[in-house]
């Protein structure tokens, strides 16, 4: 199911790539910088601190088409290749509250099923739908990377 949940969002999606390839696209800095933000946004490697190790903080700077930037921050909570990644994230690093994002990857006959959940405290349903749409554009690019 892709949609709104009681406390956030869920995206359920298939990839024509192995769980190892999808997991690598999530956890390799060079791949993450290519897909995080979709096609219209860049994430320069020199603005990215992203090593997927449990307990390690991460940060990224997105450069929008108009030149403005968004700073992202979080922490890796669980890193279990190639099946599970749990991390926190926020686009307001000065605020202590972080959303928890969980990615679960399951092998299928066609490749991999991704089930991603994100807590969205304080979001309206309209904001949650916008978050789903945004993640889908990110995952379109991740799919191209993972599927090679």
Question: Where are the predicted features?
Answer:
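Short, well-ordered beta-strand elements
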Residues: 114-118
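Hydrophobic-ligand binding "helix-grip"
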Residues: 33-34, 48-53, 57-109, 119-121
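K/E-rich alpha-helical interaction surfaces of small helical-bundle regulatory domains
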Residues: 19-34, 77, 81-82, 134-145
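Hydrophobic ligand-binding cavity/cleft-lining segments
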Residues: 1-42
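Alpha-helical scaffold segments that form or flank carboxylate-/histidine-based iron centers
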Residues: 17-18, 101, 130
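A conserved amphipathic terminal alpha-helix motif
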Residues: 119-148
